[in-house]
Amino acid sequence: MEEGGRDKTPVQSQQPSATAPSGADEKSSGKERRDAGEKDKEQELSEEDKQLQDELEMLVERLGEKDTSLYRPALEELRRQIRSSTTSMTSVPKPLKFLRPHYGKLKEIYENMAPGENKCFAADIISVLAMTMSGERECLKYRLVGSQEELASWGHEYVRHLAGEVAKEWQELDDAEKAQREPLLTLVKEIVPYNMAHNAEHEACDLLMEIEQVDMLEKDIDENAYSKVCLYLTSCVNYVPEPENSALLRCALGVFRKFSRFPEALRLALMLNDMELVEDIFTSCKDVVVQKQMAFMLGRHGVFLELSEDVEEYEDLTEIMSNVQLNSNFLALARELDIMEPKVPDDIYKTHLENNRFGGSGSQVDSARMNLASSFVNGFVNAAFGQDKLLTDDGNKWLYKNKDHGMLSAAASLGMILLWDVDGGLTQIDKYLYSSEDYIKSGALLACGIVNSGVRNECDPALALLSDYVLHNSNTMRLGSIFGLGLAYAGSNREDVLTLLLPVMGDSKSSMEVAGVTALACGMIAVGSCNGDVTSTILQTIMEKSETELKDTYARWLPLGLGLNHLGKGEAIEAILAALEVVSEPFRSFANTLVDVCAYAGSGNVLKVQQLLHICSEHFDSKEKEEDKDKKEKKDKDKKEAPADMGAHQGVAVLGIALIAMGEEIGAEMALRTFGHLLRYGEPTLRRAVPLALALISVSNPRLNILDTLSKFSHDADPEVSYNSIFAMGMVGSGTNNARLAAMLRQLAQYHAKDPNNLFMVRLAQGLTHLGKGTLTLCPYHSDRQLMSQVAVAGLLTVLVSFLDVRNIILGKSHYVLYGLVAAMQPRMLVTFDEELRPLPVSVRVGQAVDVVGQAGKPKTITGFQTHTTPVLLAHGERAELATEEFLPVTPILEGFVILRKNPNYNL
């Protein structure tokens, strides 16, 4: 068939094959075969198609004739044919298909035409045809010399193709070639409105992002498209480098403000961490109800604005931002869920389920370590409920079952039980401030700080109570009061509190532990603010300490304070890293890495993660270890345990990978895979840090693959790996009441029944799993996982960095540092109010959140939902939407406290 077809091919006579060299022979035979194939296809064409093909060929030939009067009608007809060819989206329109072989001829005809209307007309047609050719951006070239008629007339596919070519062309032109960019900009100004009007908002955004002109979006957006455009822009933020990410956020923010969507704009201003902008958005909104909603959002994020007193409803707004009602709203939720009954640690341990060989529970002997564990568990489980069975009735009895530092932590747990209840809580703690035991007094001071965590009070009770003890003769008293102040004023950047604390670091009586805790507290108070006084004081303290002092395990808190001060500030840390160069190794590497990872927390910065992986892959030989026996970073009283030395900064690097990647899901998935490798092949220092990193990447989100990994390493031969893995299990399941995790931990409790340290960790993990009886979360992200609370990250980092030396800090005397988690505790609830802020129960659908970025129409945002009546708990990755049209939410993200308005268009 093919042979016959080839013989009959009319084109053959035109081939110059006789004189061509052999390469051309091959080409010509290929051409023949293709032509033969086309001939076959010709035979398959329907009558209609054949007629169309002949007509188009005749039109092209007419353009090649000398009679110019025929050009215009021929071009008109060609254009009509191309435009009217309605076809499926999956195949090339027929006219374009049939004209494709004549593309070269049409270009020749165009070149030979006299300038004028006809020539422009021909350019338009060639531009459309160029879509089917893989030429050198000829679609754009001929568009620019064409008649400049409306883009829309050629259809969507043409506009999309043109947009792609504009973007490529733009990138090849330098800034100097402005004149050549002008016609491209004119085209863009046509393409963007067309895309906006035809449900292709994301294509318009992509084009403007490619040519770095995102600001042009604002004027083309209408009421219907703005939410989609802004959703697309904000979801691109994770994937573009500085400073483009800020430009995208600012563009979306401008769009929201244009349409008076203040809550959404405020959320983006918080993402930018631009406090002036936050204040500007808040004050420029004249709707009091919306302002109250924004005040709730600021309160949740831990931001407090000093409003002028002439602002309408000043007192209400200040009270909401201060989180004064947080405790009463939380207790209302608890009553609604019927979980007010206090729990005792045994309810959590479920010891009656443990099948010991001797019948009943084997470890009934009261040991100070187990009582300490029970103090923490009791605090975690009854957190914020205001009552328990160990401390609130007759606390002294329980406190004296603990020893020394155990008393401090046990007394402080009272603060956790009374969390956020400033007025009622402080009166209950007050009696312990007069105890004869310094440890109990110190714990009570810490409890005062904990109660005030996240809540502002005009009277400043925490400052009034704790300030007298900051320079107390007893270092024990200093610890409680300083850490208490750090927790009470975390994120406030209050100058008066910092002025009180900073001198403690340089005080001659302060032990290394006190200096470290002071640095930590200052870092928490000034978190993410780059406060100059905090930076200079901590740096000075580091410089003044001798090499031996810097080997103390508590020295790690000094650079952590520095890092927290610059949390999320990116390149602002260059000067600090330079200043740290004078410090001797190994402390220098440790401090540098720690400050560096804090600066990029939650940024998802891939380059930083690569640097950290390089640090993780460094290898320290055993010979070096022998020589460096004197260069120890951690002091370790147990000489059998070889302390970590040069590789200490590697542990920080591992934590850093999690800290940077936790911001976006793809990065977190990739980090997860990396951690698997590190656990198998890494140095001991690395392996000890990996469980902590896994905890950070999945806080309060008990994913099975992570739990299984941690469960495996909770039986590791290296005790520190197993301690950290067990604690990490608690962090991953914190506040979820996850049944599978609870069962795992009960099995571990039996497995480690004879090992007090591991058992202590299991108990802590059990307490965390049932945090606030399953109503609280430690996850630093909120508002649909868009916003990272810096205070929460500071609290988590405080604890995790301390766990890098779990044996000396957590299992030593400094377990009080676990209360750093208080800064991250938040209720995971949705409560709805009416405009007068009265609780308003409405039905809501709660289901798994679905990513709807860039989808056409109005797709469903949740799947697999159940309908509940507010107040309701939201798990990780869940989203809520109203199930009734009677009310409209003031903010689109239903989380935390939401104000609802009556829907004016609602008909009963």
UniProtKB/Swiss-Prot annotation:
<dbReference type="InterPro" id="IPR040892">
    <property type="entry name" value="RPN1_N"/>
</dbReference>
<feature type="modified residue" description="N6-acetyllysine">
    <location>
        <position position="551"/>
    </location>
</feature>
<feature type="region of interest" description="Required for interaction with UBLCP1">
    <location>
        <begin position="708"/>
        <end position="903"/>
    </location>
</feature>
<comment type="subunit">
    <text>Component of the 19S proteasome regulatory particle complex. The 26S proteasome consists of a 20S core particle (CP) and two 19S regulatory subunits (RP). The regulatory particle is made of a lid composed of 9 subunits, a base containing 6 ATPases and few additional components including PSMD2. Interacts with RPGRIP1L. Interacts with CRY1 in a KDM8-dependent manner.</text>
</comment>
<comment type="function">
    <text>Binds to the intracellular domain of tumor necrosis factor type 1 receptor. The binding domain of TRAP1 and TRAP2 resides outside the death domain of TNFR1.</text>
</comment>
<protein>
    <recommendedName>
        <fullName>26S proteasome non-ATPase regulatory subunit 2</fullName>
    </recommendedName>
</protein>
<feature type="modified residue" description="Phosphoserine">
    <location>
        <position position="363"/>
    </location>
</feature>
<feature type="modified residue" description="Phosphoserine">
    <location>
        <position position="361"/>
    </location>
</feature>
<dbReference type="Pfam" id="PF17781">
    <property type="entry name" value="RPN1_RPN2_N"/>
</dbReference>
<dbReference type="InterPro" id="IPR016024">
    <property type="entry name" value="ARM-type_fold"/>
</dbReference>
<dbReference type="GO" id="GO:0043161">
    <property type="term" value="P:proteasome-mediated ubiquitin-dependent protein catabolic process"/>
</dbReference>
<keyword id="KW-0007">Acetylation</keyword>
<feature type="repeat" description="PC 2">
    <location>
        <begin position="443"/>
        <end position="479"/>
    </location>
</feature>
<dbReference type="InterPro" id="IPR041433">
    <property type="entry name" value="RPN1_C"/>
</dbReference>
<feature type="modified residue" description="Phosphotyrosine">
    <location>
        <position position="194"/>
    </location>
</feature>
<dbReference type="GO" id="GO:0034515">
    <property type="term" value="C:proteasome storage granule"/>
</dbReference>
<comment type="similarity">
    <text>Belongs to the proteasome subunit S2 family.</text>
</comment>
<feature type="compositionally biased region" description="Basic and acidic residues">
    <location>
        <begin position="24"/>
        <end position="51"/>
    </location>
</feature>
<feature type="modified residue" description="N-acetylmethionine">
    <location>
        <position position="1"/>
    </location>
</feature>
<feature type="repeat" description="PC 3">
    <location>
        <begin position="480"/>
        <end position="514"/>
    </location>
</feature>
<dbReference type="InterPro" id="IPR011989">
    <property type="entry name" value="ARM-like"/>
</dbReference>
<keyword id="KW-0647">Proteasome</keyword>
<dbReference type="GO" id="GO:0000502">
    <property type="term" value="C:proteasome complex"/>
</dbReference>
<feature type="modified residue" description="Phosphoserine">
    <location>
        <position position="147"/>
    </location>
</feature>
<feature type="repeat" description="PC 4">
    <location>
        <begin position="517"/>
        <end position="551"/>
    </location>
</feature>
<feature type="region of interest" description="Disordered">
    <location>
        <begin position="623"/>
        <end position="645"/>
    </location>
</feature>
<dbReference type="GO" id="GO:0005634">
    <property type="term" value="C:nucleus"/>
</dbReference>
<feature type="modified residue" description="Phosphothreonine">
    <location>
        <position position="9"/>
    </location>
</feature>
<feature type="repeat" description="PC 5">
    <location>
        <begin position="560"/>
        <end position="589"/>
    </location>
</feature>
<feature type="repeat" description="PC 6">
    <location>
        <begin position="692"/>
        <end position="723"/>
    </location>
</feature>
<keyword id="KW-0597">Phosphoprotein</keyword>
<dbReference type="GO" id="GO:0008540">
    <property type="term" value="C:proteasome regulatory particle, base subcomplex"/>
</dbReference>
<dbReference type="InterPro" id="IPR016643">
    <property type="entry name" value="26S_Psome_Rpn1"/>
</dbReference>
<dbReference type="GO" id="GO:0022624">
    <property type="term" value="C:proteasome accessory complex"/>
</dbReference>
<dbReference type="GO" id="GO:0030234">
    <property type="term" value="F:enzyme regulator activity"/>
</dbReference>
<feature type="repeat" description="PC 7">
    <location>
        <begin position="742"/>
        <end position="757"/>
    </location>
</feature>
<dbReference type="Pfam" id="PF01851">
    <property type="entry name" value="PC_rep"/>
</dbReference>
<feature type="compositionally biased region" description="Polar residues">
    <location>
        <begin position="10"/>
        <end position="20"/>
    </location>
</feature>
<feature type="region of interest" description="Disordered">
    <location>
        <begin position="1"/>
        <end position="51"/>
    </location>
</feature>
<dbReference type="Pfam" id="PF18051">
    <property type="entry name" value="RPN1_C"/>
</dbReference>
<feature type="repeat" description="PC 1">
    <location>
        <begin position="409"/>
        <end position="442"/>
    </location>
</feature>
<feature type="modified residue" description="Phosphoserine">
    <location>
        <position position="29"/>
    </location>
</feature>
